[in-house]
């Protein structure tokens, strides 16, 4: 949590939560303990869940995600649109953010159908009160791609942790 004083307002660290971790009865106490141990404000942590992780036991997943949400951490649907996309999941689970997979983002300038899908996903997320993030690895082409995204979509850059600390310190 050394980076928190340097981080811009609203900056969060996102961690993938595996299906096994989501099903683990100790995941909520573990997240609570980890936040306290590292002095990390809950709103600075985002937990990312793939849609497939929700399928094994939706009842347990719903309870666990609700408890994690109550801690104040952000809950994101990771790689939205590439797996078992069910609109019912968006209604049933306490998600804060939809992350549009880089498969779509990388093709947004080349394919009108892909651009239409991204606009549709953004509109759906907006109607449900969810943030939308577009995934792309940090690179020279990132800004060009993000310029083509609909308004309201936040870039979600994949950064190396050492690079992140270096950027924050500057």
Q: Where is each model-derived feature located?
A:
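Alpha-helical scaffold within the catalytic cores of cyclic-nucleotide enzymes
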Residues: 1-6, 122
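Catalytic core regions of nucleotide second-messenger enzymes
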Residues: 5-11, 39
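Conserved protein-kinase N-lobe ATP-binding Lys motif
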Residues: 19
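The catalytic core of metal-dependent phosphodiesterases that act on cyclic dinucleotides
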Residues: 29-108, 112, 122-140, 147
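Conserved N-terminal phosphate-binding loop of PLP-dependent enzymes in the Aspartate aminotransferase
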Residues: 117
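N-terminal low-complexity segments that are often proline-rich with Ser/Thr-Pro
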Residues: 134-170
């Amino acid at each position: 949590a050394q980076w928190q004083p340097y981080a811009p307002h609203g900056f969060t660290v996102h961690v993938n939560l595996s299906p096994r971790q989501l099903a683990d009865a100790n995941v909520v106490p573990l997240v609570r303990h980890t936040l306290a141990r590292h002095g990390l404000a809950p709103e600075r942590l985002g937990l990312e869940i793939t849609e497939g992780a929700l399928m094994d036991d939706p009842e347990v997943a719903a309870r666990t995600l609700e408890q994690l949400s109550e801690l104040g951490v952000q809950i994101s649907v990771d790689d939205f649109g590439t797996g078992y996309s069910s609109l019912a999941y968006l209604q049933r689970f306490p998600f804060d953010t939809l992350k549009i997979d880089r498969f779509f983002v990388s093709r947004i300038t080349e394919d009108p159908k892909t651009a239409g899908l991204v606009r549709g996903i953004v509109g759906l997320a907006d109607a449900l009160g969810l943030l939308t993030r577009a995934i792309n690895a940090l690179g020279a082409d990132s800004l060009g791609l993000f310029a083509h995204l609909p308004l309201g979509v936040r870039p979600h850059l994949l950064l190396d942790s050492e690079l992140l600390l270096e950027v924050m310190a500057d």
